[in-house]
Amino acid sequence: MNEQELRGLIEAVRTGRVSRRDFVMTMLGFGVAAPIAGQLLMHAGIAQAQTTSAYKGTKRGGGGALKVLWWQGATLLNPHFAVGTKDQDGSRIFYEPLAGWDTDGNLVPCLAAELPSMDNGSVSQDGKSITWKLKRDVQWHDGKPLTSADVVFNWEYASDPETSATTIGSYKDIKVRAIDPYTVRVDYAKSSPFWADPFVGPRGMIIPKHLFEGYKGAKSRDAPNNLKPVGTGPYKFVDFTPGDMVRGAINPNYHQANRPFFDTIEMKGGGDAVSAARAVLQTGEFDYAWNLQVEDEILVRLETGGKGRVNIIPGGDIEFILFNSTDPWTEVDGERSSVKTKHPILS
């Protein structure tokens, strides 16, 4: 897709001829992640869709235990040290970012009171600064308030090379300062068309300054709270066995009204993709399993007459690469790269 075609597609969204969802799906097909697709529309002056959750809770709790299965189990619970989705998802039970993404690529606030935009003056005209306003009713699980000092600390923590944070790429080229206890400004060295990276999504989860400030830099791996998170999220830490089990209990002071629904959560790790699929679809031992890299015929067989269903969600992530092991130069029955041939090097 060239620039003219992209501009035409964006204009089609503006005029209503193409839906926002279809635009995002088209961009995914070209390898552009949903968040970046959403930012393209925002910078073109197309208002973000108003997102509402499908869940309309009337009270907090009452849903019993939620049991989920990640056959690649979490090995630590500090989001700045996450080495994959397994660690990010394990951490997300307890920690939260300022904002995240919905399934249509819309930015949605979490710890932020509102989203930065040019309309409200929190995105500078030159694209070199962003201002975040925090919610004022958020507490860490130990009762201390979340403030802008925590946000600034996460930048200092992650951008320090001696911390060896896996999130350093999101924080090393910015400057962050507190305007007041609930306002933070992020400055970029140059105009940033995609500013929603630091403090957003899986790489943007906020850890508490008062528990980690003594463990910056070279001492970062020694922090006891790397394995015992104290966050702002819907569940409070109960226990953790690396690679095996993460347990949380409902946070009675959670800042979102009537959430969460489930009273406890168990995130089990281990096994393989097939056994994970079977544990949900066939035996019903778990309520949900993620990353089912299983042949379609096996999933269909497990789903048919079983106790669950398979949800397939398109995305831009790369899980693995398969090499074509056939010979592209040898023709068999009028076909090149026939399965009847072998690649001269890769086979």
For every predicted segment, state its role.
Residues 1-22, 29-31, 44-46:
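N-terminal secretory signal peptides
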Residues 67, 147-154, 181-187, 233-234, ...:
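Alpha-helical secondary-structure segments
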Residues 69-124, 156, 230-232:
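N-terminal lobe/hinge region of extracytoplasmic solute-binding protein
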Residues 71-91, 111, 166, 195-205, ...:
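A structural "hinge/loop" feature
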Residues 92-96, 100-106, 200-266:
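Gly/Pro-rich hinge or "lid" segments in bacterial periplasmic/extracellular proteins
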Residues 115-164, 185, 276-283, 343-347:
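Aromatic- and charge-enriched surface segment that lines or borders ligand/interaction sites
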Residues 131, 223, 252-299:
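Ligand-site clamp/hinge motif
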Residues 167-216:
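Surface-exposed binding/hinge segments that line
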